[in-house]
Each structure stands twice: as C-alpha cells, then as structure tokens.
C-alpha cells in the first residue's frame, strides 16, 4: 500500500507535469498559425488548469490527513464548525449530496473528484478488456477468410476499427491514471459516503426496457485526425448510436460537428448505451471519440430530475424547516393529543408534492473519451405495467418475500445456486471471463464458476466442517500463496468470488509468486496450490482417482466374461458426476422431509366435497377452548349437515376439542394479499363475528412457507399472552384437507389506509396512532420478534378509536439484540436500505418502516416514490425525503432520525430500542402508561351502524363473493403431517 508521503510526492510530480504541459502549449500557441491547432492547444491548457486545481485540492486533503500542515486559526474554526455540523447528524451529508448522482461521472461540467476518477478507471478498464477480447476474436476470424478477398476486407476494416477503439480507451485510461493518486483517505464511513452520494455504479448493467429518446446537438473540443495536418478545415464526421453493441441509429454527416437530430427507439432489457463519433475517410471510417453509459444511470438521472422538478414547483425542501415557529414545538410538548396547530394536517397550507410521471428533456454536456464533449438531450419512458397506486395520495401494495433459490449442484461442501450476473465475472476454476450470463455461486462462501466447471471445483467450502473437508484426492501439494497488498490499477478479478477488483481498495491482495489476485476477505478461501494451474490439478486428481479405484473381483467360472467387461468399461466421466448431483427437492429433503417424500407415497383418494375438516387433536399443551368458541350443539350440527359436512368423528374423541369449517358462515371478504385472504364470518354457536384468515396448504408447501406459518401462529400466541391492547388477538386456528384458518377478532373500523384515503390525518391524529404503534413494536422487540411488514394496510382501527396491528405473516423470531437475518421481504415502499442491499439486518428495519409510516400519516404520501418496484428501490437507496417548509421541527427531526440509511445511526437502533423513539421530543409529553391503558380519548372514532356494516373496508375487497375457490390438488399423508398440531384454541 502506498504510504502517505509517497502519495504526496506523487501528487506534486503530477502538478509539475501539468504545469510543464501548460508552458509548452502556450509556446506552441504563440508559434503556430493553424487555427485548428490553436483551438486544440487552448482546450488542452484549460484541461490542464482544471487538473491542477483538482490535484492541489487532493494535496491539501492529504496534508490534513497527515497533520503536516498547520492551518490558520480561521481555517481551523471554519473546519471545526463544518466537522461539528457533520457529526451532529449524518443526514447532513445526504442533504449536501442530494444533487449528486452517478450521471455526474459523465457530465463534463461537474468538477473532478476522487470518486469520479476511480469509478471511471474501473468502468473503462472493464470495457477495455471486452474490446481486447473482440480484437483477439476478429484476428482469429481473419485467418478463416484468407482465400475470400471480399470477406477478408470487411474483417480487416472491423479489425482496424476495433484496434482504434482499444487505443481510445487506453488514452482515456492514461488520462485518468495521471490524475489518480493511489492513496485512500481512510475514514470509517468513506465507502458509505460514496454510496450515499450516488457516485457509484450500483447495479451497473441492470437491464431496463422502454423507449429511449436521444437528441444529438453538437460536439466541442473534439480531436480530429486533421489536428496535425497543415490544412485548416476539419474532416466530416457522424455519430452512431448503439444499444448493447447493436447499432440502432446513425446521424447524417456533418462538417461542423453540429446535428440537432433526434432519434427514438425501443429498448428491451438494455444494459449499455453508446455513442461513437466516426470521422469520414476514403478507405474506412475511423472512430475518434466515444461515450459509454449504463442505461440504468440514464433512467435514474431522469427520475432524480423529476423529483428536483417537483421540489421547485412546491414549497417542499429536503431539509429541516428552520423557520418553523417555536410555538408549534412548545404546543406539541405541552399536550401531544390536544396540541394547538395539531388539529389540522400539515399540508393545509402547502400543496402535496406531485407524484405524476414527468417526462423531462434536458441538455447536458457529456465527456467523450479520450477528449472532447458532446451535447445531447435524453428522455426515457420506462415500460411498466399497471400503476400500483393512484396519481396522488397513497394506495395498497402487497408484501413480497424472496423465494429460496434452488440448489442446482453440490461439490466439496459448496451449495451452488444459479445467479444472473450483470457485469463481467471470472470463473474461479477455468479463469475465463463471462458477462451478462448466468453462472453458479455458492450461497455460503460466494465461490463463482461456470456450470460446466462445477465438477472441477477442488477448494472446500468454508461452511464445511474440518472432518468433511476434502483432502484433494490425496494430492500432496501444499504450497501456500504469498499474498501482499497492492493497488489494482488494471483489469483484475478476484480468484475466488470472481468479481472485478475495484480501484483504490485497501484490501486487494496479489500473490507475488503466481500472480493471482483476490479480495482481502477471500484470501483465506483460496487453496494452497501456488504455481499449479487448475487444469493440471484436475488432471492429476483424475489419474489418482483412476489408480485408486478398486478392481472388480473376478469369478472363477466367468473369467473370460469379466475380462471383456474390463476392456470395454469406460471411466466415470465428469458429465455423469454432474448428472448425479442432487436436485432442489433432494437438497431440501432434510428441511422438509415429510413434504418431499410425496414422491414415494400414493395420494389420498379424492373426496367429493370442496373442503373437509380434519380431525386434528390439539396437543397436550393446547389450552382448553374458550366459552366464546364452544363447540356447536347437536341441533346446530344437524341444521348445517347439508352445507359442508365434516368427516365423521370417532366416538372416543370429545367434540368440545374441535372447531370446524361447518361452524362458520362466511359473509364478506375483508382483505386480500399475496399470501391469502381474510373473510368476515359468523360463528353459528354464539352468533358473534370473527375475521378468518384463509391460506391454502398447497401454496404454503410450494412456496416453502411452512416455517413462516408456524412463526405466525407463535406470534399470535405471544400477542395473546398479555392481551396486548394494540395487537390483534387470535381465538382459534383449525384446518381442513386443503386449507388452514386463523380465527381472529373482528375489528369493525377497517384499516388506516381506507381512512387516510378519505381524509388527511392531522398531526394530533398521526401522533396518537404513531405512539400506539410504537408500543406495539416495543412489545414485539422485547419478545425477540421483528415485525417486517408495518404499513397502513396492517393497522386496524377499533370502534373505540384505538388501533390494532394485524398480519404477522412476515414476522421473524429470535431477533434479540445482536441477532440478524438476511431474508428479502416486506412491502416495497417500507423496505429498509439494508434489506434492498441484501445485507444482514436486525429488528432495526422496523424503525425505518415506522419512519415511512409516520411520513405517510403526517403528509399523506410516501417519502419514496416510483413508477414500479425498481424505481421505488432506487429512490430508497439514493433519494432524500422532502418536507414542507411549515412542518414542525420536531416532526422533521423524528422522520430524519428514523429514515437514516445507516442502521447503526438510526433512531431506535441502540440497546434502548423503542425507548429511544419514545423519548423523542415529538412524543415528549405522552404518558406512555396512560396510553397503554387506553386512558387517552381518541380524537376520531369510526362510524359503525351495524356489525355487518362494511363501509370502513375497501370496496375492492367487499365487492367480491365470500366463497372458497375449489382446490383440485390432493395432498399426501406426509404433506398433511406437516400441519400436525396447527389447530388450537385461545384462553379467556
């Protein structure tokens, strides 16, 4: 690793070089009479001056880092002031970087930065490796057309064009390398700040589909081949547009580098957009400049500008409203329920920020490689399906859960799953590159290889125990690698995980003996085979395996026959080995043995009824049923025998221990989600109403949701344990041959989504609901439960005006302090950044969702908007929420604390958990014990005329017919065994 003093010395040398270039260019300007040469030299002088400015800024930063420079007292004060303000809240960094994006990497009018230089070096290095492989392939093709002159001429032209592109990319890399200082100013959050600023290529090649509109206006400072010639006129040029290396448009030929031409074309799963400038020649046209932009960055930039446009049209700002009156703050502290100015919504004097899609065309000067700029206008309309929510306000969104990936192969402990990679990867076995294509990755240690190379994998997985680790077939070759840190300035890939090694990384290592490179965290996973190629290793091991293979014993009376068999017997091939690898059903056998054993079991005979109740005896630990759910009388059973008859029960079984589908009459559909639906039902025994959640067994088994079902039932038991006032309680659960049922208390007021769509909540009302939700989350977290699906749809409003949290389908248990998980699940608008980044996360994701919930209740819209899930995810990872200028400061402070991307800095993330949120000034005067005991009088109570009145529920659901759809699938006995013990009853 380059030391600080070496980095400073290198920076000084680069400044001296740029100054020398300026002096030489000025001398040439004074001596030449060619106007084209003068223009080009003046442009070079401006570029060098800009480079010197950047290098001096880097030198100052390095000096501050080393402490070698003594600043003046005024500089210290200003620097300390900035540092203190930055430490006061980490959201300030996000606010300063709100107008920065990955598109700035290509904008020639944006200043240079270390992030831009390092990222462009990586981007160009990867592109250079592709072009070099293309040139190598063209050279091989040219040898095939040695006898066909016409085809050979075309190949020669392509070869020259490819070599010219390689030269252009090498010149660009040289230019950025001359500005790159190989020293990373190590701060604890340097990578996080870079990610927060948007100056990174997250999801570089994520494909997008839609309509792209490009207008090419003009060029400037382009370097024509006539630059060194005596004549003053420039050669004609034209632009060619490519999408994923396929030509989609071509401009006319221009002598003045001006076009003003517009091109509109559809793209399907496009990854990269290119513009190449060609100069017209007699023999063949020469590429003189190019620009390569990932299509995702174009779509993201237009979405970001749309949000900026919304800010300019409204009085919303991405910062705290410093002008908020202190009277509001004092009022909120005196009485949070009846505070002055809190009876009306915040948006009364401030219009809601528009959410309609805004098609924006903007002129931008983008940097060409290696020199020059191009002025273009871009517009992109994403191809989307039906909108997920209305143009304004809020709408319902279903939760999502990522299904477990299929294990397609197992080798020496690795559990390989198929992954689609959208960048250039390198196989850790054969060392060949593959891009934009699927490969295999170990879900435990991230080892990457081709599917064809899986049988050649020799390195054991780190998840494998020492007793199970392979001894590499007895190959006694143990020479460890000599890894040393190095600066990755070229195209380098990790020898284990196959990813491209980023530039300016402090944890990149290279073996000084054999030259392989890897990440620091991957070095200990590489086997000790320094100096030996993988092909040689595999060949040696194959020969050892053949030599150690036991010979088949020969029978005395079949000597000749056995001899002939040995002559024609073939060795075991790698293909046969791959074919015998376990399938997904075999790989998951241990986890779901009763389910997967269906293959060896004959199905049960099909019954003529739609649903038959199963006689499931509650376990010994199941409480006795409550009186409210007493079993129906014989008269009741006889009156309902014509509707849905139960399976005849053994006389020895007591009927009081059963509740069946025949005991309920379904009246209406109350809700529907991705995992089931909820219906209103009347219990025939006592004529009381209950909400019954219905789930299909087939879907549970197919989606591997059996553990989630058990967790949901256990969370109901936790909620019932103390009869928490703000959690939905369970009264019973039962099952039929095709479905499982949760019998829950019926909340007549509907959910908050219906009420907020009818009327915007006031600050008083939002604070009241938020405080009760906070107590519910506190109870969950104290019991080690992460809720993970907090949203308005899952908060029910009781007739007395208090709330209940429902739907425990995404809950995660054993989430006490320090425990984490990585399941990708939740509702898109409420998912925390760490979930989207597929990182390990804790129960702190609930506080991010709580921040989104409070934002929606206070302002009537979501803080992160988008046309589809991908745009919403991009907004969560890069955008800053907007606040009206009249919003109280304590409310903004609460939202900013909750909507902090760093989970370690998020409000509520510490060991105090909910107590930290409850202590915030926004809830300062709430007496939490009184709130828990429902001593506060709610400001709003839903209007309920009759228990059958469905006016407080969404008409989209209530208009549906309350029937159970037929299920034709018949589950086996082993599959039914998976649901043993599900039926239970609650206690009073």
Curated annotation (Swiss-Prot):
Active-site residues, Swiss-Prot/TrEMBL: 789 (proton acceptor)
Signal peptide (from-to): none
Residue stretches making up the C2 domain: 189-315
Single GO molecular function: diacylglycerol-dependent, calcium-independent serine/threonine kinase activity
Enzyme class: transferase
Similarity-based family: Belongs to the protein kinase superfamily. AGC Ser/Thr protein kinase family. PKC subfamily.
Protein name per UniProt: Protein kinase C-like 1
Organism of this sequence: Schizosaccharomyces pombe (strain 972 / ATCC 24843)
